[in-house]
């Protein structure tokens, strides 16, 4: 049950098909339950780790019943559950049990110390934006999806370049020949967009970035757009073209299909430990200051 801003029910979500994750999840569940919170598990997580004694709920049921979700996994786990819980405004606490951990900012070794503090009400809250996209074919929408990181239109690994026609707010911008085009949120600017030479956007920046993938013309550069922009990308030429959403779901495209992308009305609340710094995350994950003095240790 949800009661104002107080946390009563805590949902636990784990990374799928991950050896060794059952023990830390069970430990965390016991720790949280001892503090007097009701603990529930995401159903797939409960089934995979074989835990009993806690209710097992679908993401929709978690959204309706839980006050906060604690996610133990990598960024992909956080992206997946974040999209599903976004309509319910369920806050997320991310514990890194993956490789990179840009958005799962609590180390697994620190979870028993930090999660209870956050659940007691001591945290820094941050809202992250989402994209919503639909595919239009012959004037009719055929597919709809949310994206936390990015919407990516690209060729398959065995086809040549594609030609895409991009417009913003109904105004023609360009035709582009490339391997594809990324539409990324600020959160997604440190994902695929970054590897394609896109800029890093601070998560609180109100913007969306378009990043070409291996463009034929070097003058096709990334561009940051206002976050209320309505972006349309039409398939002009090419074969075996796909669109994917956070690299977790995709659909095949045909010539003249249009992908319409805009900011979603939903946001995803993140709860960070007190003292959280996005810049510290960048330093650590991108290996900035590796040859600096102890200045990095002093920074916060």
Swiss-Prot record:
Gene Ontology biological-process annotations: NAD metabolic process; NADP biosynthetic process
Catalytic activity: NAD(+) + ATP = ADP + NADP(+) + H(+)
Cofactor(s) essential for the protein: a divalent metal cation
A GO cellular component entry from the record: cytoplasm
Top-level taxon of origin: Bacteria
The UniProt record lists the keyword Ribosomal protein: no
Protein's UniProt name: NAD kinase
């Amino acid at each position: 049950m949800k009661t104002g801003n107080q946390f009563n029910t805590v949902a636990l979500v784990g990374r799928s098909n991950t050896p060794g994750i059952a023990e830390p999840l069970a430990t965390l569940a016991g720790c949280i339950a001892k503090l007097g919170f009701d603990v529930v598990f995401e159903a797939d997580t409960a089934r995979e780790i074989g835990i009993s004694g806690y209710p097992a709920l679908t993401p929709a049921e978690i959204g309706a019943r839980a006050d906060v979700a604690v996610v133990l996994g990598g960024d992909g786990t956080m992206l997946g559950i974040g999209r599903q819980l976004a309509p319910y405004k369920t806050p997320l606490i991310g514990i890194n049990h993956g490789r990179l951990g840009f958005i799962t900012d609590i180390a697994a070794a620190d979870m028993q110390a930090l999660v209870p503090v956050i659940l007691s009400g001591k945290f820094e809250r941050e809202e992250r934006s989402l994209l919503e996209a639909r595919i239009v074919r012959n004037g009719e929408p055929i597919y709809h999806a949310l994206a936390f990181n990015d919407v990516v239109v690209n060729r398959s690994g065995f086809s040549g370049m594609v030609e895409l026609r991009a417009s913003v707010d109904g105004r023609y911008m360009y035709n582009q020949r490339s391997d594809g085009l990324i539409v990324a949120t600020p959160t997604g600017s440190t994902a695929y967009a970054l590897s394609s030479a896109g800029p890093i956007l601070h998560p609180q920046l109100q913007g969306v970035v378009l990043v070409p993938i291996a463009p034929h013309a070097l003058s096709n550069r990334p561009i940051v757009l206002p976050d209320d922009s309505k972006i349309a990308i039409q398939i002009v030429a090419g074969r075996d073209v796909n669109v994917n959403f956070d690299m977790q779901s995709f659909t095949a495209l045909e010539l003249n299909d249009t992908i319409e992308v805009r900011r979603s009305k939903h946001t995803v609340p993140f709860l960070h430990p007190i003292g959280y710094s996005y810049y510290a995350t960048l330093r650590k994950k991108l290996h900035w200051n590796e040859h600096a003095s102890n200045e990095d240790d002093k920074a916060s």
